[in-house]
Regions:
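Acidic/polar-rich alpha-helix caps and helix-coil junctions
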Residues: 1-134
Length: 134
């Protein structure tokens, strides 16, 4: 969060420092993996977004991040896959890719969530977000 905020405040050097701090921790003392981020501009923002995707992979941030960044129509379309990993009797592992679902993100309606009906009923001036019934 902080690295992204610093990027948007025009403090790219601070943003890079914090992304690299996270990468240093993830390296666990190794220097041959996860090189420091040196990019600037849009390339730096892409690195920050990727780092967020990796670091927060199982913490349910991605759904909201891709909407906040307005990139969902690029990354939330097409076939989504999972993987089954099974250990074989000889000790090796077998990796089998399987399709979970096809997705088709519809912008702009899918960028917004519906406003709860009870909130709309409380205020006649409140309008439902596009793509949802009133």
């Amino acid at each position: 969060n902080y690295a992204e905020a610093m990027y948007h405040c025009g403090k790219e050097d601070v943003a890079r420092e914090y992304v690299n701090y996270i990468r240093k921790r993830a390296r666990g003392g190794r220097e041959d993996i996860l090189p420091d981020v040196t990019e600037s501009g849009e390339a730096l923002l892409a690195k920050i977004q990727h780092e967020r995707k990796v670091e927060l992979a199982f913490e349910e941030h991605r759904f909201y991040d891709v909407r906040r960044w307005k990139i969902a129509e690029k990354v939330d379309k097409g076939a989504f896959h999972g993987i089954n990993i099974t250990k074989q009797t000889d000790g090796t592992k077998k990796y089998e890719l399987f399709k979970i679902q096809d997705r088709d993100f519809v912008a702009p309606a899918n960028y917004l969530l519906p406003i709860p009906r009870y909130e709309i009923q409380k205020n006649d001036l409140l309008e439902q977000n596009p793509g949802y019934d009133k």
